[in-house]
Amino acid sequence: MLLAIDVGNTNTVVGVFDGDDLADSWRVRTDPHATADELVLLYRGLLGEHRITGVSICSTVPAALRELRRMVVRAFRDLPVVIVEPGTRTGVPILIDNPKEAGADRIMNTLAAHHLYGGPAIVVDFGTSTNLDVVSARGEFIGGVLAPGIEIALDALASRAAQLRKVELTPPRSVIGKSTVEALQSGMIYGVAGQVDGLVRRIRAELGAHATAIATGGLASLVVKESETLDRHEPHLTLIGLRLVFEKNI
């Protein structure tokens, strides 16, 4: 079984693949201060009886990746390990001004999106930030859009506006909020859906083609039903990319 680990700024998504099938998955809080010893205990607890035969990792948090490397050496020392970083074979041409700026998670999303749906495609990743990653018909990463994520936007409002506070992220009864809570929920959910729809339409117009729009990320389920442009919802797109990149390198 392959252990796939996607370390994000807020959460780490962990998956176990049995061949092509995702057998199990977990979402845990990313702790950049966790030691290798603490990570060994965490992963042993998660994995239980799963017999791991390989490990594939991507990370957007350098501090967390350092300790994760040490954990892998301790817990999986004799197994093949792929860490997505500059020089790793991904099969994804990166056609932006500075390819080193492209996050490993964005490249994994590009790889998985083209594998599953072909191209052109737009991956909309709802996480700490809301990322729109654009995939060409040939599977190239050609750039995209970065915007504040839903929770970051809500945190900013709650911290800077004296009479506003954090609210539960659930759809309100209507777009027109009947209370401060509902108005905030409407702005977060319908506002982000409208933002994404506008960006997807602009990207499609720039491409001159109907690119398949694929939603992923921990907050995608909040927006998918309210969007007019998202075609697919693949919650574990990054993990699928990690499986594919492992196969390319081992």
Swiss-Prot record:
EC number from the UniProt entry: 2.7.1.33
Subunit structure: Homodimer.
GO biological process: coenzyme A biosynthetic process
Residues annotated as binding ATP: D6, V7, G8, N9, T10, N11, T12, V13, T128
Function: Catalyzes the phosphorylation of pantothenate (Pan), the first step in CoA biosynthesis.
Cofactor stoichiometry and binding remark: A monovalent cation. Ammonium or potassium.
Family assignment from sequence similarity: Belongs to the type III pantothenate kinase family.
SUPFAM superfamilies recorded: Actin-like ATPase domain
Keywords, comma-separated and alphabetical: ATP-binding, Coenzyme A biosynthesis, Cytoplasm, Kinase, Metal-binding, Nucleotide-binding, Potassium, Transferase
Cofactor(s) listed in the protein's UniProt record: NH4(+); K(+)
Binding sites annotated in the UniProt record for K(+): D125
Pathway where it operates: Cofactor biosynthesis; coenzyme A biosynthesis; CoA from (R)-pantothenate: step 1/5
GO cellular component, one term: cytoplasm
UniProt-listed HAMAP family: Pantothen_kinase_3
Subcellular location(s) per record: Cytoplasm
Taxonomic lineage of the native organism: Bacteria, Bacillati, Actinomycetota, Actinomycetes, Frankiales
Annotated binding of substrate, by residue: G103, A104, D105, R106, T180
Extent of the signal sequence: none
Gene: coaX
Organism the protein comes from: Frankia alni (strain DSM 45986 / CECT 9034 / ACN14a)
Protein name: Type III pantothenate kinase
One GO MF term: pantothenate kinase activity
Active site per the UniProt annotation: D105
Record's keyword annotation contains Kinase: yes
Reactions mediated catalytically: (R)-pantothenate + ATP = (R)-4'-phosphopantothenate + ADP + H(+)
One Pfam assignment: Pan_kinase
